[in-house]
Amino acid sequence: MADISPRMQEYYDRLNAGLAQAMEVAKTARKTGLDPETVVEIPIANDLADRVEAQVGIPGVAQMIRELEAVMSREEASLHIGDYFAEKKFGETTKEEILDHAIRTAMALLTEGVVSAPIEGIAKVAVKKNDDGSEYLAIYYAGPIRSAGGTAQALSVLVGDYVRRILGMSRYMPREEEIERYIEEIRQYNSIMSLQYLPSEREIRLIISNCPVCIDGEPTEKEEVSGHRNLERVETNTVRGGMALVIAEGLALKAPKVLKNVRKMKMDGWDWLEEMIQATAGSSSSEEKEVGIHPKDKFLRDLIGGRPVFSYPMREGGFRLVYGRSRNTGLAAAGLNPATLHILGDFLAVGTQMKIERPGKAAGISPVDSIQGPTVRLINGDVVRIHDAKRARELSSQVSHIIDVGEILISYGEFMENNHVLVPSAYCESWWRLEGGTTRPADEDEAILQCESGLYLHPDYLYLWDDLKPAEIRSLAEFIHKHGTLADKTLILPLDPTIKEYLERVLCEHQVREGMIRITPCRIVLKCLGLDSSLALSDSWEKELPESALDLVQFLSGMKMRSKAGTRIGGRMGRPGKSKPREMKPAPHVLFPVGEAGGSRRSVQEASKFSYQANTEGGNLQLEMGVRRCPACGTESYKNRCSCGTHTEPVLSCSRCGIEVQGPVCPQCGMEPTSVRQYTVNVRQMLQQAFADLGMRDRDVELVKGVKGLVSRNKPVELIEKGVIRAANKLFVFKDGTVRFDIIDMPLTHFRPREIGVSVERLRELGYLQDIYGVPLQNPDQVLELPPQDILVPEGCGDYLFSCTRFIDTLLEKVYGLPPFYNLETRSDLVGHLVIGLAPHTSAGVLARIIGFSKANVGYGHPFFHAAKRRNCFHGDTLIEIYADGILEEIPIRRFVLEHLDLSQAGVDALGTFYADPVRPAHVRSVDTGGIPHLRKITSVSVHKAPANLIQFSTSRGKNLLVTPDHAMLVWDVSYLRKIRALEVKIGDAVPVWESGVVISDRIVSIDYVPCEDERVYCLTVDRDHNVVGNGIFTGQCDGDEDCVMLLLDGLINFSRSFLPVTRGGSMDAPLVLTSRIDPTEIDKESHNLDVCATYPIEVYETALRYGNAKDVESLVDRVERRLNTPAQIEGFFFTHDTSDISAGPLETMYTQLQSMLDKLDCELSLAKRIRAVDEHDVAERVLKTHFIRDLQGNLSAFSKQKFRCTKCNTSYRRMPLAGKCKCGGNIIPTVHEGSVKKYLQMSRQICEEYNITEYTRQRIEVIDMNIESTFGEEKVEQMGLADFM
């Protein structure tokens, strides 16, 4: 990491000191032997070099990388790695080994080694023979190389060329038929998968003829080539997707980047790249490209009930784009004026996600009051611009029409990140100041004077003239000339509907009194319309007039103006996430089994009274727990500490051979041993002893909840005392032994002390000594820069963590015999304490410090803090078998998830992670722990931000699977299946696969690693067995929870890998490693596009006017990427737009306040009627087509195929038993009810009556209505008597 300033060094020293202090306490507590292990089980993460070494598994690589990076760039180092391997410094024996290690290590370095994955997508490397007998290098790429990105794909070829030169190997000399095969195969692959860039035949021929390395690949598609088959040096006739991707999206598309590295390394033999670049540039320049953008309605395609649309794509009255970043935006977060949030029905609260038209797909919403708010028409006809939240709340009930929803603040970095052209911005004060403006005019007279001095008209006094046609502007001017009067600087006009509409469209504020329109002030309006003080038309109207509206008003007024409309951005509401305690279902207090004795609540108290036989003392239970042995006295029990005071150790035995095993596998059969036994445990006595040891009485805690059974590998147990203390503090334990709170993340780079509920004095104690301008910190309104690992948590999270500190202190004092650590009296005392932040589907926690609290229900953190966390699942191309509506179909998981993402139930955070119930019932093939296949229901689908790298598994039967590093994989263990993390899978592991209609065992033969540049990864949650067939391999699912925080000491003391489940979730979402210091160079590259300047250069706005590429001005904008490897990479950030309060606006979305879907839909359509930029009829139609009809059809189908379950023991039946009761005597009930099938039927009918719905959609509703009636019969009409009306 680069050098840092003394201030930041002190900051990291504070963090490290706090971590060391907590670590010492945790180590001391663990030494007591009361936990499964006597050491802290969360290690501290190391640097990139160490991670690469761990990934490739070659000792000594880390030191080599550090030496190289000290004297050269990363790209150069990735090539020079080959020098070390060629010298066989790491034990290589063959050319294949040298080439393989060098290429994989180089790619691991190029992709920064984040999340433990080196070179995914390379199947193997081989040394082959040319026709002249010389040797050449062939690199076999697999289909998932797509996720590596074009640059990494191309550079892997360059690395291969560099190393083969060192080894004295010849270049690849292709045969003519091989070149023709490449041309045919790449074209065919494009027709199957659609390449990002399809090179021409000439380009393909040029690449293959000149590339010194043979780009080969494994078959990835079902289709075979029709010509050029059975070639001697091409091992398959099947289409090789990996090869096509590397040539098309790597070498062809990224040729300029490859050439740049070639020149830097002074490598010969690549001059042909220049020829290809020139040919491509020439062909593109000769084509006339259309300048501009078009409306994109993709964000509207999955519209559902209850989620309002705020603006249609590029529609008048929609969000007007303003470039800039506030201290609480950036990194997929956009800014809206708090007044806009209130006027839009309070549906957009702080942190609510909004699906947007451009530049990306979604953005978390933050309040920014330095941009303009909405313009509305009140019930009395007045038109008012509203720019502050207080006035918006006062007027919200009087609004009849929302003419303009206001401005939206999106940073330049978002356009860079999404590779989107810059589009014209609405004229704003930042732009005005770049063009010479200095002081905001106090009134319109001063604004006119500024224009007379040569400045552009200030944006506060601009009207949206470009929303009118020149003919309409003329009509407006002539009407005022004929019918208007002036009185005390007020223009008075008769109330004419057409004229009022014109005034509304240009956002001209006015009042309606006694049938007259009153405009005050009006001088600029009159000048723009070519009217003098007597309302006479100026001579300019008689001259030749410009054709555009904006040019016309400039011509008439003599003032320079820019467009106030700019580019309109469409948007609609996504689902807000919830910040809440993390709870399992059902939520336990302690990881201690109570079996069926605990009842449905898993009550330890109830279990302590349970007896298997009448008239016997209760509490003696038969429980399955891990076998442990005391090394001192040899006693065997389930306890972590023996009665003699010595820590016990697991006793491993082979269930097949019946022998005790010392190592990780049985020496006789090679299977992994287990450590499980049935024990008779007196739970009553244990509970009483726990209360006594804690100095508590039974009535102090009403309910302590355990678990039905342990699901970890060796089944160790937690102390019941921990559960009692948690229950007393109303806390719940997660699967790994920790207490967590889920929060929705929002970015923040600066804050004011008054916003976070912390005194100036306390902040100075934490190291905040001066504001961003270097002024000593003295008052709560100064702006302070947030360091990368300081966070704000919601107030509710603060309360929960405060309770957790009381749990930890009691635990230390009463159980471990140590002094309390926290000793807090109030929630505010949490400030300055350390926590662990963890994103779902990851295994790496990030150290953070709480420095305050957010009134909004979100967690604010530095963009680096959020970017340092990862999300993991399946690659989008993974094929899964879906059974829906009686049809079994194999489709990519990406397609299924996107088609079934029900946004009425979808969760989302600021980083764009979605998870939801599927829009209609569907099932997938799953396998239970015994290897028996079943069709299981999909209970949710999810879309996640992709991690930096992915892992590819290949089996001996030719199956391949691409997953994220923390994904759960199924492996055979003797006679049952267990789950392990993808990172823990080894070559030779037996995995279950689906082939020819049966589950069989297959072996992992290769594990490859690839950097991932895809935007998203995908997953789904499967009922009961929680696994699915992906590409023919049974594999686990992912969970879909929000990011979470836990107290540092809670994690260090109570987390144990031994508690992690084998069958559900596994080791995912567990802090297996702790990153103590964030290195900006090693985190998600999205954060590198964060702009950190105080103002944009004028070139940004000028480039946007001509729809130029964002990269055209990247060298002019101060972004994190330009600061990497300097002290400025973590401090000295600025922002272009300030905001007065990061928690302004609604704190809870109206969506969560409304209880029924009927109320939500009514509000959605009511709001659509009021917003000018929304077509309410189209909204109603879309809701029917994409939500209600799908739901009605799906539920009706599910009703006919439903199962039945017992209310007592939860046993499931395919059909109702003849006896009408369960074997246990419990009642049998259906799982799909009539009410759930009909729930949207009446609403759908009502929509068809009230809105202009197409005849086709109406008839679909009628058909569904008839189907439902034929299934359930006509609704009963209740006969009412006369008394019912009295």
From Swiss-Prot:
Chemical reaction(s) catalysed: DNA(n) + a 2'-deoxyribonucleoside 5'-triphosphate = DNA(n+1) + diphosphate; Exonucleolytic cleavage in the 3'- to 5'-direction to yield nucleoside 5'-phosphates
InterPro entries: Hint_dom_C, Hint_dom_N, Hint_dom_sf, Intein_C, Intein_N, PolC_DP2, PolC_DP2_cat_dom, PolC_DP2_central_dom
GO BP terms, alphabetized: DNA catabolic process; DNA-templated DNA replication; intein-mediated protein splicing
Keywords on record: Autocatalytic cleavage, DNA replication, DNA-binding, DNA-directed DNA polymerase, Exonuclease, Hydrolase, Multifunctional enzyme, Nuclease, Nucleotidyltransferase, Protein splicing, Transferase
EC number: 2.7.7.7, 3.1.11.1
Post-translational modification remark: This protein undergoes a protein self splicing that involves a post-translational excision of the intervening region (intein) followed by peptide ligation.
Region listing for Disordered, in residue ranges: 566-586
GO molecular function: DNA binding; DNA-directed DNA polymerase activity; single-stranded DNA 3'-5' DNA exonuclease activity
Domain of life from the UniProt record: Archaea
NCBIfam families in alphabetical order: intein_Cterm, intein_Nterm, polC, PRK14714.1
Family from the record: Belongs to the archaeal DNA polymerase II family.
Function of the protein: Possesses two activities: a DNA synthesis (polymerase) and an exonucleolytic activity that degrades single-stranded DNA in the 3'- to 5'-direction. Has a template-primer preference which is characteristic of a replicative DNA polymerase.
Record text on subunit structure and interactions: Heterodimer of a large subunit and a small subunit.
Protein name according to UniProt: DNA polymerase II large subunit
